[in-house]
């Protein structure tokens, strides 16, 4: 019953996605992954049994397309919880004397509630209330689709504008969403061979300067430290591709020195 309720939930995403003309790239139920081209893989990555589906829509090239895709994305995101609730209450009502129907209904309602509050409902809300998150979300979707031609220009331009609005006097006060958005901006700009665009992003320069002085070891949040490390690696790659090997080595050396000092301080305090 639990596995069936997970499958119905994910199929709900696909059904509502199809209604608004979004395509499914792959569907995962536990270790089973079914791709759009019919390829099936068995891969166990997690310690728990869950489900996921990856949907994408038309390329966003202007404001009007962006507005439409926000609505379509929200519909497909909420399609899973809605389907879980409908099937859950339906089975509880229609199969009152059936044990399987009872458990399926309970699991479906629990899955619908959990995903509505955390995994599906929250992104659907943020897409409309947080422009930085919305551009970050659609840029990551465009990057991970199986489409041969990926169009980043509009999303990169708009995301850059949102990143310029971010103000913080320390990396600790910068949200993980903002750091993730910055990483995707830098990565996609690198794909477009537009590395120089990063130089005008104030938050990027501020982050690099703080890391050079404090190192990465000072940041306790593992997720944040992981994203910061990825941002630094991208900067080193950009410097190397620009033929500025000396600056890349200097950046690496300062990071190493700062981390060594931080490690020494931690050992001394202990």
Where are these regions (language model features)?
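Acidic, Ser/Thr-rich low-complexity segments on the non-lumenal side of membrane proteins
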Residues: 140-177
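Short, flexible coil/linker elements and helix-boundary hinge sites characteristic
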Residues: 95-98, 130, 161, 190, ...
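Amphipathic alpha-helical repeat scaffolds of TPR domains
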Residues: 134-145, 172-193, 220-241, 262-270
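Hydrophobic transmembrane alpha-helical segments that form the core helix bundle
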Residues: 61-148
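Solvent-exposed, well-ordered amphipathic alpha-helical segments
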Residues: 1, 7, 92-102, 229, ...
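Small-residue-rich helix-interface/hinge motifs
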Residues: 2-62
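Alpha-helical repeat scaffolds
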Residues: 153-167, 194-216, 243-258
